[in-house]
A protein has these predicted regions:
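Short alpha-helical segments that sit at the start of domains
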Residues: 24-58, 169-200
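A short, conserved structural fragment
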Residues: 95-105, 236-246
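N-terminal leader segment of winged-helix/HTH proteins
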Residues: 1-35, 141-162
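Short acidic, hydrophobic short linear motifs in intrinsically disordered regions
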Residues: 58-78, 200-220
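Short, amphipathic alpha-helical interaction segments positioned at domain boundaries
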Residues: 118-147, 257-287
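Exposed, interaction-prone assembly regions rather than primary DNA-binding/catalytic cores
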Residues: 138-199, 284-298
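Short amphipathic alpha-helical interaction segments
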Residues: 81-96, 222-236
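Minor-groove-contacting beta-hairpin "wing" of winged helix-turn-helix DNA-binding domains
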Residues: 107-115, 247-255
Length: 298
């Protein structure tokens, strides 16, 4: 039976698995920064997942199916995730960066788009990374199954996208999480903070995450340093981040803020698990599932 969001959030292995997941996303960014930025805010994540699902769902016997501006707009604007103009600009960006291409006559309306090979590979790696988190919770065989049958991506991903675009808890992050996720490249920043959250301070109220160099991070993530500094100031005001002294050599990530983020991410992983189970059936376990009683502090 697929995990609930509550079971995932309370699992003793989840925080560590999520930290490694954030590190894997950072590696994907380093390998393909421009494409990774298409998933780097919550709005772009929703747009990207919906767009990829639509192009997979294309049916030649159904006129108007597939990834078109109209179809993407219907999904996205129905939950107020983006405006019509944002959808248009997003597709234009995908096309200009060659992450999608126009199928058939480019003068014909409506234009239909399909993902290019680099996009397929990126989504495949993204799904593997998500399934690996779930496998680390129960010793399951999700990753092995997808690697053995990569064509399952075409069936599982649309289920994830459709469910995600209908799940209120995923659509609306908690306020402090939204502070990052609704901003440009905020997902990249959040991944960077989470992957550093290894050492708790005495008392366990925060995690030491080292020095935050806004200039360096802004260059790496291809965003304005002013924008990033403003984001960090708001995060400090909201109690997400703090510095123990005036030297600012060692930033602290608030434990309760990390817990909020973990619970929100658990909603997504539950969606992924339910979608996987619907297509692939129950997961085969390779080792006993850890007891869910004692929750690891996050």
């Amino acid at each position: 039976m697929a995990y609930s969001a509550e079971d995932i959030a309370e699992h003793p292995n989840f925080v560590e698995a999520l930290r490694d997941f954030a590190a894997s996303l950072r590696q994907q960014f380093d390998d393909s920064p421009r494409l990774s930025r298409m998933l780097a805010s919550h709005q772009r994540w929703l747009l990207s997942q919906a767009a990829f699902a639509l192009q997979l769902e294309y049916d030649p016997s159904q006129p108007g199916s597939g990834l078109t501006t109209t179809n993407l707009r219907e999904i996205i604007t129905s939950n107020n995730a983006a405006s019509r103009n944002t959808v248009l600009n997003f597709l234009d960006q995908l096309l200009s960066y060659k992450f999608v291409r126009i199928v058939g006559d480019p003068t014909r309306r409506p234009k239909r788009y399909e993902a290019t090979e680099v996009t397929y590979q990126a989504v495949y790696l993204w799904l593997l990374a998500n399934l690996l988190v779930l496998d680390r919770l129960d010793g399951g065989d999700r990753v092995a199954t997808l690697r053995g049958r990569p064509e399952l991506l075409r069936l599982v991903q649309p289920q994830i996208a459709r469910r995600a675009c209908l799940e209120p808890r995923w659509l609306e992050p908690p306020p402090r999480v939204a502070l990052f996720l609704w901003t440009e490249a905020g997902g990249l920043v959040m991944d960077e903070l989470v992957r550093r959250a290894v050492e708790p301070v005495p008392g366990g109220e925060a995690y030491e995450i080292g020095r935050i160099d806004a200039r360096q991070l802004a260059e790496q993530f291809m965003i304005s340093r002013t924008h990033l500094q403003r984001l960090f100031r708001r995060a400090v005001d909201a109690g997400c981040l703090s510095w123990p002294d005036d030297t600012r050599k060692n930033c602290l990530l608030n434990r309760e803020f990390l817990r909020e983020y973990c619970h929100w991410q658990a909603v997504k992983f539950s969606i992924v698990d339910r979608a996987y189970e619907q297509i692939c059936g129950p997961v085969r376990l390779e080792k006993p599932e850890p007891r869910l009683g004692a929750v690891r502090e996050a």
